């Protein structure tokens, strides 16, 4: 995992999102719990319906170095990759 803001991590729980229909319920929960983190599948992250707090999202699995840089520059919390040893 590549993390942008490791020092600010205060959550011990989160939601795994791998289907687009989970976004609406997750958004409602994000408004109720500011410590809730989201592990978001890459294609869901790029969905036009994606509207979660970026600073609480980890995007998976991103295996292209340029794409990793682009996603991290969007201020997400982190990225999961299979190529960490090649970066």
Report the location of each language-model feature.
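Short loop-to-alpha-helix "cap/lid" segments that border enzyme active sites
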Residues: 1-87
């Amino acid at each position: 995992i590549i993390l942008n803001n490791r020092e600010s991590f205060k959550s011990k729980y989160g939601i795994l999102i791998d289907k687009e229909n989970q976004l609406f319920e997750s958004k409602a929960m994000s408004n109720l719990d500011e410590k809730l983190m989201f592990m978001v599948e890459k294609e869901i992250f790029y969905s036009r319906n994606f509207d979660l707090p970026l600073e609480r999202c980890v995007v998976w699995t991103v295996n292209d170095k340029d794409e990793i840089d682009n996603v991290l520059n969007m201020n997400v919390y982190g990225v999961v990759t299979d190529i960490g040893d090649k970066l």
